[in-house]
Every structure is written in structure tokens, then in C-alpha cells.
């Protein structure tokens, strides 16, 4: 452990002692982490907000499987009208925690608990919308002046027809061949 790294996700331990006693037993859980300073350039999680998972852990032979829905509050600017917009992104998760985790695939199971902090942190980052809209049909600040369907300014500069002719479909067929003469 290097420890103390800036931006390290907070720990959020979930005890799995009870369910580990009987294969297949389940337990409802609602772990959460409080985040500060999480966000992308245009969208972020408001400081102090909680990322909450509502789900359950189930005992399996390799360890435990965690399933549920992660709720991620966010705020940003509408990409069309630039008004402030807020929302809650919801992401389904299904993750396996085991004593011998596979790098990049499963998470560590430590004795009698799992740490879901890193999962909540990573899931929240991926859940943030890249281009938020205040509403699906937001028309922008002045729809008459800036229609969302762009008309090219270059339409009247045409100097003859220089568009490529349609490609002979026989050439396309040849693209897939390996022209190895042996
Ligand atoms: Zn808008």
C-alpha cells in the first residue's frame, strides 16, 4: 500500500461474514461514498454528494457477487442552451469479489468484507453524461438564428462535380481477399 494518494477513492466496507456461511445466501446492502472534486470538464458531481448503490450481495463459491444500481447525481451545462442542468445517472452493476481476484475483472475479497469504494468511484466517473441536455428537445438559445440542423456555408462555392464516383462493387469484393501469390 502506498497510501495517502490524492484522489484515492474512499473506503466503503461491506461485511460479508453472514452470507459467507451459506452458499447462495443474500443480503440487501446500500453502500455509499461521499465525493469531492469528481468531474469532467463540463459535468461534475456536486461536492459532498453521495454515490449510492442499492442492491445485494450473494455468496457464491468463489466469493461474493454484488449486484445493484448505482445512483450518481451530477450537474453541468446544457450543451445547446448552456443553462444549468442537473440529473441523476443510474447504472446497473454486477461485480464479483473473490479472494484471488483477476486483474481488471474481479475485485478483492478481504477476509470478511469487501471494499466497494473503488467500484462506486469508477462507476460514477463512467456514468457522467458527456453532453448533457436540459431536455431532449432543447432547441438552444435562439432556434430561429441557430437552427440545430447545420446548413453548409460552402453550398454555393461548388466548382463542378468533384465528388468521387461510386466505387465499383467488384473492387470492394477484392478488398477482402488475401492476394498472396504463394
Ligand atoms: Zn438546453
Annotate each PLM feature.
Residues 1-75:
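A positional/architectural concept
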Residues 45, 59, 71-73, 82-88, ...:
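Mature extracytoplasmic or otherwise solvent-exposed domains
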Residues 39-42, 60-62, 79-80, 90-91, ...:
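Short secondary-structure boundary micro-motifs
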Amino acid at each position: 500500500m502506498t497510501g495517502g494518494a490524492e484522489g484515492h477513492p474512499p473506503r466503503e466496507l461491506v461485511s460479508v461474514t453472514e452470507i459467507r456461511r451459506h452458499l447462495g445466501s443474500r443480503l440487501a446492502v446500500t453502500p455509499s461514498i461521499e465525493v469531492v472534486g469528481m468531474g469532467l470538464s463540463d459535468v461534475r458531481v456536486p461536492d459532498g454528494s453521495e454515490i449510492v448503490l442499492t442492491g445485494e450481495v450473494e455468496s457464491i463459491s468463489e466469493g461474493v457477487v454484488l449486484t445493484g444500481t448505482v445512483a450518481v447525481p451530477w450537474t453541468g451545462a446544457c450543451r445547446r442552451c448552456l443553462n444549468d442542468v442537473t440529473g441523476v445517472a443510474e447504472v446497473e452493476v454486477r461485480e464479483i469479489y473473490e479472494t484471488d481476484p483477476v486483474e481488471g475483472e474481479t475485485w478483492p475479497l478481504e477476509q470478511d468484507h469487501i471494499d466497494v469504494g473503488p467500484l462506486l468511484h469508477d462507476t460514477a466517473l463512467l456514468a457522467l453524461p458527456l453532453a448533457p441536455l436540459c431536455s431532449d428537445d432543447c432547441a438552444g438559445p435562439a432556434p430561429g438564428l441557430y437552427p440545430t440542423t447545420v446548413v453548409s456555408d460552402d453550398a454555393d462555392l461548388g466548382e463542378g462535380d468533384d465528388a468521387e464516383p461510386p466505387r465499383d462493387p467488384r473492387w470492394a469484393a477484392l478488398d477482402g481477399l488475401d492476394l498472396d501469390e504463394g
